[in-house]
């Protein structure tokens, strides 16, 4: 199971970490994903859901 939101498709983003000398090093920003139990097609499943999807009411916990 990849760490991707089952509702919105949000996932980790990549970019650069910059030092004081402006040297660039690759790094990742992870999405705020929570593993929650939700009802999908009448079945209770445990999936990764972004905090934004939970707060906006796009999905409801079981």
Curated annotation (Swiss-Prot):
- The yes or no answer to whether the keyword Ribosomal protein is present is yes
Q: Name one GO cellular component term.
A: ribosome
Q: Where is this region: Disordered?
A: 1-28
- A GO biological process held by the record: translation
The UniProt keyword set, sorted, is: Ribonucleoprotein, Ribosomal protein
The protein's matches in InterPro entries, at most eight in alphabetical order, are given as: Bacterial_rp_bL28, Ribosomal_bL28, Ribosomal_bL28/bL31-like_sf, Ribosomal_bL28_bact-type, Ribosomal_bL28_sf
Q: Which domain of life is it from?
A: Bacteria
Membrane-spanning parts: none
Instruction: Report the GO molecular function annotations.
Output: structural constituent of ribosome
Keyword Hydrolase in annotation: no
Q: Which residues form the signal peptide?
A: none
Which is one Pfam family of this protein?
Answer: Ribosomal_L28
Family, according to the entry, reads as follows:
Belongs to the bacterial ribosomal protein bL28 family.
Question: What's the protein here called?
Answer: Large ribosomal subunit protein bL28
Instruction: Report the source organism.
Output: Bacillus cytotoxicus (strain DSM 22905 / CIP 110041 / 391-98 / NVH 391-98)
What gene is behind this protein?
Answer: rpmB
């Amino acid at each position: 199971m990849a760490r991707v939101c089952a509702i919105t498709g949000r996932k980790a983003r990549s970019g650069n970490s910059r030092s004081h000398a402006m040297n660039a090093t690759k790094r990742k920003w992870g999405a705020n994903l929570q593993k929650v139990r939700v009802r999908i097609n009448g079945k209770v499943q445990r999936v990764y859901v972004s905090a934004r999807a939970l707060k906006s009411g796009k999905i409801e916990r079981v």
